[in-house]
Amino acid sequence: MLSIHPLKPEALHLPLGTSEFLGCQRRHTLPASEFRCLTPEDATSAFEIEREAFISVSGTCPLHLDEIRHFLTLCPELSLGWFEEGCLVAFIIGSLWDKERLTQESLTLHRPGGRTAHLHVLAVHRTFRQQGKGSVLLWRYLHHLGSQPAVRRAVLMCENALVPFYEKFGFQAMGPCAITMGSLTFTELQCSLRCHTFLRRNSGC
């Protein structure tokens, strides 16, 4: 996590007219770039990014607002957000699953005893797209999962056009997903977290 810890300011006696400057200084004490797990308080910001990213393309969202709050309450450690100066710009939300393949139930359930992390959604704010942020976030997220001993693999479903993107991170196609949304069909992919655990242990991160 990249963060800045500002020193406690001393009492200063400054001339009038400096309030705007001080306000600017205070804003600059926020971390320029920070990665952290999300909290239920981040749910609205996450949903706004998700809705804009998915509605125009597929007409539906992977997670509704109440479902985002649900997962961020039950398993915040399976999420990761990228913040720029305190504002959420990209995120991933996951939960645990305890079966080999995804089912309709896996869209809304968190199975605490599961060994599989189900990635429900990866979304990037429109202002920050086409900058590689989704790739950076996914790489960090997989390393984050690799640091959790109970999690053995990650699974997700995506449209066929996105399969090559996820294959670059070690995901392998398992075939058609049993889940459909209207006329949309998906490919199910899985990724062993062993390599990400090894890379994390040997990267000094």
Swiss-Prot record:
Its EC number is 2.3.1.87. Changing residue 168 to R: No effect on proteasomal degradation. Transmembrane segments: none annotated. It is found in: Cytoplasm. Gene3D superfamilies: 3.40.630.30. The modification Phosphoserine is found at residue 203. The record marks 118, 120, 122 as: Important for the catalytic mechanism. GO terms for cellular component: cytoplasm; cytosol; perinuclear region of cytoplasm. Acetyl-CoA binds at residues 122-124, 130-135, 166-168. The modification Phosphothreonine is found at residue 29. Belongs to the acetyltransferase family. AANAT subfamily. This is Serotonin N-acetyltransferase. It comes from Rattus norvegicus (Rat). The gene is Aanat.
